[in-house]
């Protein structure tokens, strides 16, 4: 047909691609599914986590005589809040079983919380990662870091003299060496949809496939992250213009790399660092 379609959880031999475990898959694909309806995934300390819990019951019988337990834990697996809800869900329906209104604690450092849902005595469960940030931004920019938005002779002189430079380029100035940010992975086949969009004179998707990074890098000391894209990156990705780094050595890896599609296969970077003479340069082409 149209070419390679990089979709699906199983490969052509019905083997797991390793994208997700069977246990995690069943959290959202089973005869009973527990759902937390939340307006967002990122919160500030002292904010209220509000939402509701719903249960879909597609077993052969009414779901009754059981309790659903929800638990909010921090990154040390300490319980922040917890509650039990009795269930009475008719067969073939989904229903709201209770509200969520949790007062989040004040925190000094960003942290990942987890909201877990489970029905006692069963294997039915689900979980949602949440990112909690200090209510007030206490980040102090070190005096030895020079923040610039425009590349000029002064920036070159700073690096030549051994300074540290943090550069936020204006993407409009570098349109020929950037692509636009895309949070979700590109769908199906980049070449096919690119040609269709061009034919009907519609914007072409950036065509990228998410982020790749090392969570232990010092730049993430106050920003919890996985090695891959997750919801705390949404706003930054939508306001990013990853740089095309094809001219750099094969073994160079940006701090935050953007994975390109197999058709185009650029090396793309959203955050990258370089030694420039005796100086150090950190380039961030997204709005932090």
Show where each model-derived region lies.
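A structural signal for short, well-ordered beta-strand segments and their strand-loop junctions
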Residues: 1, 166-169, 283-284
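Short alpha-beta junction capping motif
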Residues: 143-191, 278
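Beta-strand-rich binding/interaction modules
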Residues: 47-88, 95-101, 110-120
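Catalytic beta-strand/loop cores that center a nucleophilic Ser/Cys/Thr
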Residues: 194-288
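Extended substrate-binding grooves/exosites of carbohydrate-active enzymes
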Residues: 1-47
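Beta-strand-rich interaction surfaces with strong enrichment in secreted/lumenal proteins
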Residues: 39-41, 84-90, 103-105
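A structural microfeature
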Residues: 81-83, 126, 256, 270-271
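Short beta-strand elements
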Residues: 86-90, 123-139
């Amino acid at each position: 047909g149209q070419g390679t379609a990089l979709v699906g959880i199983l490969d052509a031999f019905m083997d797991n691609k390793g994208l997700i475990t069977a246990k995690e898959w069943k959290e959202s694909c089973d005869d009973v599914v527990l759902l937390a309806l939340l307006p967002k995934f990122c919160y500030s300390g002292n904010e209220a986590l509000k939402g509701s819990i719903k249960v879909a019951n597609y077993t052969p019988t009414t779901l009754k005589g059981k309790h659903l337990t929800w638990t909010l834990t921090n990154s040390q697996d300490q319980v922040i809040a917890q509650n039990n809800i009795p269930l009475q869900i008719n067969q073939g329906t989904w229903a709201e079983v209770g509200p969520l209104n949790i007062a989040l604690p004040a925190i000094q450092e960003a942290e990942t919380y987890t909201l877990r849902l489970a029905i006692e005595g069963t294997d039915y469960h689900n979980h949602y990662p949440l990112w909690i940030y200090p209510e007030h931004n206490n980040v102090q920019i070190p005096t030895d870091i020079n923040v610039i938005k425009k590349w000029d002779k002064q920036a070159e002189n700073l690096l030549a003299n051994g300074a540290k430079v943090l550069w936020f380029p204006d993407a409009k100035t570098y349109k020929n060496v950037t692509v636009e940010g895309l949070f979700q992975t590109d769908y199906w086949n980049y070449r096919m949809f690119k040609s269709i969009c061009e034919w009907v004179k519609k914007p072409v998707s950036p065509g990228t496939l998410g982020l790749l990074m090392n969570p232990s890098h010092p730049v993430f000391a106050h920003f919890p992250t996985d090695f891959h894209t997750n919801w705390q990156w949404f706003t930054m990705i939508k306001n990013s213009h990853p740089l095309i780094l094809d001219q750099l050595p094969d073994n160079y890896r940006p701090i935050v790399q953007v994975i390109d599609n197999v058709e185009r296969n650029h090396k793309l970077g959203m955050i990258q660092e370089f030694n420039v003479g005796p100086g150090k340069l950190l380039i961030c082409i997204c709005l932090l």
